[in-house]
Amino acid sequence: MCIRDRVAGAIQENFPKEVEAATSYCVWMSAPLYYGSVRFEANKVTADSLFFQTMGIDVLSGVPEKELMQKDVVFLSDRLARKMFDQENPIGKVISYNKEIELTVKGTYADIPENATVRPDAVISLPTVWSRGWGNYSWRGGDSWIAFIRFRPGADKSVVNARLNDLIKKYRPAEDQKVVGYTAFVKPIRDVYREEPDVKRMRNIMSILGIIILFIATLNYVLISISSLSYRAKAIGVHKCSGAGSGKILGMFLLETAIIILFALLLMGLILLNFRDFIEDTTAVELGALFSLDRLWVPLLTVAILFLIGGALPGRIFARIPVSQVFRRYTEGKKGWKRPLLFVQFAGVAFICGLMYVVMLQYYYVLNKDLGYNPKRVVVANTDFGNKENQDYALTFFRGLPYVESVSSADSHPVYSYSGTMIQDESGQSLFSSRFCEMMEDYPKMMGMVMKEGRMPRNENEVAINETYGEWMHWGTELLNRTVYNSGYVCKVVGVIKDFRIGNFTNPQAPFILMSTKNFGNCVHVRLKEPFAENLQKLNKVSADAFPDKTVDFRSMEQMIKESYNSIRVFSNATILAAVTMFFVMMMGLIGYTTDEVRHRSKEIAIRKVNGAEASGILEMLVKDVLYVAVAAVVIGVAASWYVNDMWMDMFAEHVPVSWAAYVLIAIVNLLVIVACVLWKSWRIANENPVNSLKSE
């Protein structure tokens, strides 16, 4: 079960019959670990002593219930311990967190599988942060803490949910309900991830894509098989005349399908090995985990279904045809099977093309849309320089570098959003949560932010707000000299900053409070001169030399923005891959259909030409035959893509404008490709001497 806030311990204490264990953890300590001078990047959590018991993680060495009650203690995953110490015993080894805190390794635990949402390689004891006064682990705060509880087998979870709000009232002051409000409940850990709106949305869309690709590919194979009946009918007839029964004929087709699928699987294996990085990036999981034994039934079941549909359907059609009709009935074009299959292919390709167009358009839209600040050539690094003297030295050092254009700092940066604070009215009633950040006076100018009116705050009693804050407060156009009640602080509005993007464009525009600081550090921002990449390397090297006792890693802000849309990029790549795949699948099916139609109707076409029909008329007849199927299919496919695009775009606060004309153009392009393919395959027979066709008859 997963819950938020500091309630885990209280639940365990008050529900001993239902709850077996409970734990709280946070992910603040995200800086690197060091063993000597060697740096290690690893996922870390700061947790209490019942973390392993609650989460059901196997402890390989050490006693976490005892050791994690001490400060400056760490437990390492078996993977990280081997990476750090090779075959040496890790117990008792001392490592460093961010070159600031020495941590003693007191135990190891089993590696956590990739499919876990909580997958730390290091668990640091909770007293490590308590002893330094970091965070707010109290009943009046601490919303950055995540808590889990483990129920006893057979426990009634509804008992806990029914009494949970009353339990919280015992610990939280009564005025908190009025000021900030709260709701407490327990929820299965599996549902926490699966029921996130973005996860559900992407799961539905990717499921639709996968089903469409598999379904159309299978139907395409069936279509090609059925299209081949005319020239394979004699062979089947010979087999039947030689005594082969329906089962034998069906078995022949199943064997043929099995051989084709086997070669397809071998080709797939080669593709997986040669494009491993791309595939793992797209699926966000290693191939070993994707095809692990406990999940292997999924691809095996998929292959089995494809085998049954692709082999059994055309096989049964042949097997059930009487010998007396084999040579006669299938010398004519039989479209009853082929047209519906072709319809599905056309609709599927139109759907994926419409989806691909909007996904790519939205991805490049959010990457290039004005953010309200200028991230070009800006790099950021999180570090604390300590006292004022060291801060001044660091500021002077960075400003003195010849390849640095400007320098400033703030508590954080806008790419990953800011911390929040509750805003109240004069009576203390909670209104909403606002983002806030302390910035040096020159920071907005350095970042290209626009101060619409007023000035920067100069002391702790002054703030600047953004436009959205004024809108949420319903203050109209008169924003200066207003009073802000901010979690117990009363401040005067002295400036209004133009809205800028906080987080990425999947987040709605949030209200924002800007406060002043004269301290240099926390999140250092540097705008470099060109050449950017070369100067970034220089900056990181000289920073490491100038501050050897600190971790000073500058990262490109533009790259961070791109990474914040990584899931969108992956989805865009997936839709492109799906569209290209389905385009070629459709082309194979259409070519097979057209070739078969031309073969069947060669005598008809020859007679029409003998009677005076022009080549253009023949081509028009064949094109119309396909368009009867294609037009309706493409319209349905494009309409379906519009619906799914609308569902996908709900995850963004800002949408790229897409008019109906774009969907019409997508439909027209699809139809033009279909017509071009038909003309290409029909051109020879339409311009051929009709005598040749009549001779062959």
Segments predicted by a language model, with ranges:
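Short, small-residue-biased leader/transition segments that mark boundaries at the very start
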Residues: 1-3
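N-terminal Sec/SRP start-transfer signal
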Residues: 316-347
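Small-residue-rich transmembrane alpha-helices
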Residues: 169-170, 257-320, 351, 361, ...
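Membrane-proximal juxtamembrane linkers immediately C-terminal to transmembrane helices
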Residues: 15-19, 58, 118, 290, ...
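Intracellular coupling helices
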Residues: 219-260, 320-331, 588-627, 687-696
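Membrane-helix entry/capping segments
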Residues: 165-212, 231, 245-246, 275-298, ...
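Mid-to-C-terminal secondary-structure elements
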Residues: 48-60, 74-198, 396, 400-563
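Hydrophobic alpha-helical transmembrane segments of multi-pass inner-membrane transport and secretion
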Residues: 199-234, 261-262, 266, 337-362, ...
